[in-house]
């Protein structure tokens, strides 16, 4: 089982007496891009926050194993030290920090060459952005790209990308997918969370989520077909059809 980086076993999470995640099972292999596909409200982001260890997303049942270590109740800071990072769907602004400082936060020590490489990877000229401040003068698309650049610069073991294609103006989907492939080629395992089935063309494997649970894990094309033919048209019938 050395090739398995992340394993989720029977994970359930309640909010106000209602399950937002129910009996989730998932296996992600080291070095792969694993796509999690589902409609808005399927539980994808909740699963991402649970894996990251966010305060309000500690599971009621089940386990999260990272490199076969049980991290279910490990604080978010400890998970970050293990090499897990999350690119939020709504990027954190960190008002007042220079972009170069923000990109160096996950590094043992600031590395100018790596920061410049990360900015170039997301099509932001280093000369124009290195010394800019992370503030409201940046557009939503710029903040999203800076968030992705921060993950790229960290070179984590596991990068959880929550809807990385949303809110991006100048960076096309193909550019984003190319960046994700570069992350994986550099040794980072990627969990790609999306509601766009076309984003899965870069994935090595995939899972389909609906109503807070993983309904299917396996071949990318089969996941895309289920999503296109059933989930978009009849989300309430999908669970019964599988």
Where are each of the predicted segments found?
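The feature captures the beta-strand-to-loop junction immediately N-terminal to the Walker
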Residues: 37-39
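ABC ATPase NBD coupling module
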Residues: 58, 70-85
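Q-loop/switch helix immediately C-terminal to the Walker
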Residues: 90, 96-111
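Hydrophobic anchor residue at the start of the ABC signature
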Residues: 148
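ABC ATPase C-loop
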Residues: 151-152
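Walker B catalytic motif
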Residues: 163-164
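Conserved beta-strand-loop-alpha-helix hinge in the C-terminal portion
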Residues: 213-236
């Amino acid at each position: 089982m050395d090739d398995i980086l992340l394993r989720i076993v029977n994970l359930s999470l309640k909010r106000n007496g209602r399950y937002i995640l129910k009996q989730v099972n998932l296996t992600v292999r080291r070095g792969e891009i694993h796509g999690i596909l589902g409609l808005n409200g399927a539980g994808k982001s909740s699963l991402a926050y649970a894996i990251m260890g966010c305060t309000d997303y500690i599971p009621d049942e089940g386990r999260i194993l990272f490199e076969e270590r049980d991290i279910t109740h490990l604080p978010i800071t400890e998970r970050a030290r293990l090499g897990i990072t999350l690119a939020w769907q709504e990027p954190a602004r960190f008002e007042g920090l220079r972009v170069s400082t923000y990109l160096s936060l996950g590094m043992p020590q600031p590395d100018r060459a790596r920061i410049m490489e990360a900015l170039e990877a997301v099509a932001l000229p280093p000369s124009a952005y290195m010394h800019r401040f992370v503030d409201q003068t940046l557009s939503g698309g710029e903040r999203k790209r800076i968030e992705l650049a921060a993950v790229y610069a960290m070179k984590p073991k596991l990068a959880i990308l929550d809807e990385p294609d949303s809110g991006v103006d100048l960076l096309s989907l193909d550019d984003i997918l190319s960046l994700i492939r570069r992350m994986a080629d550099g040794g980072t395992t990627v969990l790609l969370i999306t509601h766009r089935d076309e984003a899965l063309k870069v994935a090595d494997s995939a899972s389909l989520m609906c109503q807070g649970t993983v309904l299917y894990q396996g071949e990318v094309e089969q996941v895309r077909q289920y999503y296109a033919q059933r989930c978009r048209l009849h989300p309430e019938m999908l669970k019964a059809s599988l």
